[in-house]
């Protein structure tokens, strides 16, 4: 199935020192220089954004962030940025970003998907053509890595147990052969799982893991 709509993707990014606190300290074998945590968070974000920008279903990526380093990196990759003007947490930031895109088809994407492949996102967005609001559960089945809305409000409900909340709000759960899209990184175990799938070049360069194949 080929995506028909042109999707605007919104990615939220906290300030680097405040993000992914369960990854600090890095596990043995994945440790690095003193700023390794911030560099890892930035690498996860960069690989996620780069994969999204490479999907033919995506017309643009907008990152909502107040972090200067994150903003500079994703801008270099070709994404737009807006500041987190609401400053009230993840879901208001996503709503702000969705409005800022000006698009009718908007997808909220987690910022920690280093194993995401462009073709996985393309396939998921094609599947999302089936309903006004759809979501992709994470690998555990309890969280959400992708939420889509076409011609309707995004109404994000990210956070612990978000899959159940999105389903209760009328969004349709999508499943498919997209392990990289489902593999968000919150813990050292998640990170090892992503490395086993093959991560993008930014994360691979930082941690010495296997980069995912291109093409």
UniProtKB/Swiss-Prot annotation:
Its EC number is 2.7.7.105. It comes from the Bacteria. Pfam families: NTP_transf_3. It catalyses: phosphoenolpyruvate + GTP + H(+) = enolpyruvoyl-2-diphospho-5'-guanosine + diphosphate. One of its GO terms (biological process) is F420-0 metabolic process. It is an enzyme of class 2 (transferase). Pathway: Cofactor biosynthesis; coenzyme F420 biosynthesis. Phosphoenolpyruvate binds at residues 144, 159, 162. Keywords: GTP-binding, Nucleotide-binding, Nucleotidyltransferase, Transferase. Coiled coil: none annotated. GO terms for molecular function: GTP binding; phospholactate guanylyltransferase activity. Belongs to the CofC family. Guanylyltransferase that catalyzes the activation of phosphoenolpyruvate (PEP) as enolpyruvoyl-2-diphospho-5'-guanosine, via the condensation of PEP with GTP. It is involved in the biosynthesis of coenzyme F420, a hydride carrier cofactor. This is Phosphoenolpyruvate guanylyltransferase. The lineage of its organism: Bacteria, Bacillati, Actinomycetota, Actinomycetes, Geodermatophilales. The gene is fbiD.
């Amino acid at each position: 199935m080929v995506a028909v709509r042109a999707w605007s993707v919104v990615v939220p990014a906290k300030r680097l020192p405040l993000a992914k606190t369960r990854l600090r300290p890095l596990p043995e074998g994945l440790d690095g220089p003193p700023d390794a945590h911030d560099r890892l968070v930035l690498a996860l974000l960069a690989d996620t954004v780069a994969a999204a920008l490479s999907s033919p279903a995506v017309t643009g990526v907008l990152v909502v962030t107040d972090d200067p380093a994150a903003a500079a990196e994703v801008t270099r990759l070709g994404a737009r940025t807006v500041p987190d003007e609401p400053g009230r947490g993840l879901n208001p930031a996503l709503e702000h970003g969705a409005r800022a895109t000006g698009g009718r088809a908007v997808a909220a994407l987690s910022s920690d998907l280093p194993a995401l492949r462009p073709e996985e996102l393309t396939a998921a967005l094609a599947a999302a053509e089936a309903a006004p609001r759809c979501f992709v559960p994470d690998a555990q089945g309890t969280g959400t890595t992708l939420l889509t809305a076409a011609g309707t409000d995004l109404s994000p409900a990210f956070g612990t147990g978000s899959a159940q909340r999105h389903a209760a709000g009328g969004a349709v759960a999508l499943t498919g052969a997209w392990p990289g899209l489902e593999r968000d990184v919150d813990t050292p175990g998640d990170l090892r799982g992503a490395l086993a799938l093959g991560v993008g070049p930014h994360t691979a360069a930082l941690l010495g893991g296997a980069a995912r194949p291109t093409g």
